[in-house]
Amino acid sequence: MRVFNSTIGKVKDGQMEAAVGVAGEAAKLVGRHGGDVRFFMAGAGAEINSTLFSIDYESPEALGRAFDALGEDAELQAFMARVNGPDSPTVLTAQAMGMELPLGRTAKAGKGGVLEVHTSRLNPDRMEEGLSQAAEVCEFVEANGAVNARLLQLTYAGLGSGLTVLTWEVENMQAHARLGTAWFTDAGLALQAKSMTANPASVQVSSELWNEIPL
């Protein structure tokens, strides 16, 4: 079971270049203890100049080992003190942890430059139906150019705890546009209709696009 830890930040005015540099430094410090580290900038749906620093781990045990090591890393602790100081180019605003939910399928391997994120709240007693619909969506988007389609659940995220997050990646905005067109085919419209009933399995909370910034 893959798990993740993510940090949302807000870049101060005129500090974008410095913020990317700090993220690169963080990736090196954190990455030496394991995990797949990635950095994104808000494209649409999120607050302007927001950033997403995400670390994926293969299992809860891997995350636990990494976090214990991070807690004892003096260099990282000094770095975090600087990042949280008044001269930091970024203000850290939120942190969350979560896990990937099993959908009975294997996601198409790969990464894209654009991350699409849809956050929802499952209605009571509708988990099985929600997972089934998420699996259908993942199959559909991957058949139309996306990769790494999966369903996550926020486990430690403040008021967002328990929400599900459907994500996938596409190569670029042209690929995103092609996928958008596919949603208006017969198959895409039929899939959308399942979430637009009077009593859906889940209710959408937000949708966002994030652009990956190579570190």
Where are these regions (language model features)?
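Short S/T/G/P-rich N-terminal loop/turn motif that feeds into the first structured element of a domain
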Residues: 1-215
